[in-house]
Amino acid sequence: MVADELKEVVVPPEEATFWLDRWGYWCNAHGRFQHKKIIDYFHAAIARDEKGYFVGQVNGDCREKVYFRYEDTALFVFDVLLDDRPTLVLNTRQHIPLDPDALFIHNDYLYMRQDGHLIKFNERSMLKISALFEHDGDTCLITIGGERKAIRDRDAAASSEDGERHSNP
């Protein structure tokens, strides 16, 4: 059957029985998922369309899309490949180049924006990428290929712009 001919079953986020917590763990009413194969499958099945992020699969003659809730973002950096040009390994298994100009800090966490996606570094990836960091007073710098760049602190920038602290990255 051609993919365009598949019947589509859509579950809205308010009816989904699972979600991503702010650390990138899949959860349901009983707590965090425990089975690695299921966790990996869910992460690899994340996609996005105009309605938001969903976990998708083809099951027989149906394309299933379950839009899910997430506490912070749906995309996380799970690993960093430290080469001349570092590569980020996302929870979806996608590999993307690190863009130092797209990095920012918010609430003591490192994020990167790419193509309209907000990507958060989890604790493991933060530890790994910290080998590239330097601190110069209040500024966090990242060195890639001999070039040092300042990482924006979104909280400080927002605070200096309008006197308010913003909670959403």
What are these regions (language model features)?
Residues 1-169:
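Terminal leader/tail segments of proteins
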